């Protein structure tokens, strides 16, 4: 086992330990690429639904080339992702436990979309290098559907199966408000799964979602229609910060609750964004922000979650934010104190951490 500081087992030099760590990272990166292929080409789903399969059967079912399918399934067997029998034709299958992670897109363990996110950011490396050297950034839109869809489907199980079932009921007054019905705003909703989950969990509310990405808004409308809630869930292409009302109009708010799920750290103007949230909320209405569960302050020993967040910040969140002139450039690792400073600049008096437990996210109530 190689530690973060580069030290390894007894008798291993720091250089050897770091070399081992980079080799392990290379294996991990290679596996993510193979997971991307299996996800996007439908190979995992075919093995899950119809396995065991030979490479010819796998290729035929997915409309792919047998030679590539054969190489991929052998790599997957060597990596331990799929099982292979000992027969001469070597049929391969996907264990159910692995299907939970790689195929079942509503399972809380579904992590295949991580590969899409990494492929999206890796394909942006030439533009990232240019931005790092000369300034500017790389827009979320330019990272393509792998970034947009990967982010959306990665969070979907949590929204659909935990948000209204476990998380929001903890906030008793908010739960009561939503149960009674009313108007709800979902700012920066992406492909709309948070809005859809709110509507499914609280059948009396009407949800208005807002986002700056046209492709996300269009996808959100399709998703709401497919889930049968498009009569109560509506999406608009709006720059929330750019549309912030004057301070004097804050009391004219129309929403009984306002949410912002995992988007504030990406926003170029978080103070303007939160000013809008405050303005459109009715007096005393809850404004809820869900964002990354970061440490309270910078700590080199913060652990793997913070390592992952910094990785996303380097290649995705910070470059997207910096692609907008005048961006405050928060980055993925937005700490409690940073959010609090934005909220107070936007006119809020307090920021409370809600007693909702999640490994990746923290929920804040602004008031």
Please describe what each predicted stretch is.
Residues 122-272:
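Conserved adenosyl
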Residues 347-367:
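Core SAM-dependent methyltransferase catalytic element
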Residues 64-75:
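Short amphipathic alpha-helical interaction segments
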Residues 271-283:
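A short glycine-rich, Lys/Arg-flanked "PGG" loop and its adjoining helix->strand segment in the class I
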Residues 183, 285-286:
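Short glycine-centered segments of the SAM/dcSAM-binding site in methyltransferase folds
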Residues 55-61:
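A short acidic, leucine-rich amphipathic alpha-helix
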Residues 25-40, 46, 75-182:
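Conserved Class I S-adenosyl-L-methionine-dependent methyltransferase catalytic core
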Residues 290-346, 352:
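C-terminal alpha-helical "lid/dimerization" subdomain adjacent to the S-adenosyl-L-methionine
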């Amino acid at each position: 086992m190689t530690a973060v500081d580069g030290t390894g087992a007894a008798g291993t030099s720091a250089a050897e330990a770091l070399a081992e760590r980079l080799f392990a990272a290379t294996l991990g990166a290679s596996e993510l690429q193979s997971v991307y292929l299996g996800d996007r080409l439908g190979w995992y789903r075919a093995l899950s639904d119809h396995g065991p399969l030979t490479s010819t059967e796998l290729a035929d079912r997915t409309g792919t080339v047998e030679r590539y399918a054969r190489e991929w399934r052998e790599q997957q067997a060597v990596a331990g992702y799929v099982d292979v029998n000992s027969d001469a034709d070597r049929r391969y299958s996907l264990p159910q436990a692995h299907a939970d992670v790689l195929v079942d897109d509503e399972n809380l363990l579904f992590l295949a979309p991580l590969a899409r996110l990494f492929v999206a950011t890796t394909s942006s490396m030439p533009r990232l290098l240019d931005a790092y050297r000369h300034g500017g950034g790389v827009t979320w839109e330019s990272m393509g559907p792998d970034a947009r869809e990967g982010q959306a489907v990665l969070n979907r199980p949590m929204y659909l199966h935990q948000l209204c079932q476990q998380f929001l009921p903890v906030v008793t007054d908010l739960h009561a408000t939503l149960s009674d019905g009313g108007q709800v705003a979902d700012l920066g909703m992406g492909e709309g799964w948070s809005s859809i989950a709110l509507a499914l969990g609280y059948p009396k509310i009407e949800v208005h979602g807002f986002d700056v990405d046209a492709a996300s808004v269009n996808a959100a409308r399709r998703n709401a229609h497919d889930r049968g809630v498009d009569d109560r869930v509506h999406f608009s292409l709006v720059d929330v910060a750019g549309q912030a009302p004057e301070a004097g109009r804050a009391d004219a708010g129309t929403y009984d609750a306002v949410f912002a799920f995992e988007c504030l750290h990406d926003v170029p103007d978080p103070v303007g964004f939160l000013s809008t949230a405050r303005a459109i909320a009715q007096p005393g209405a809850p404004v809820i922000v869900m964002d990354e569960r970061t440490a309270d302050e910078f700590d080199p020993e913060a652990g793997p979650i913070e390592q992952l967040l910094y990785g996303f910040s380097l290649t995705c969140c910070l470059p997207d934010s910096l692609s907008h002139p005048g961006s405050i450039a928060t980055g993925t690792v937005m700490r409690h104190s940073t959010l609090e400073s934005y909220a107070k600049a936007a006119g809020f008096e307090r920021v409370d951490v809600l007693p909702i437990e999640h490994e990746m996210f923290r929920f804040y109530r602004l008031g």
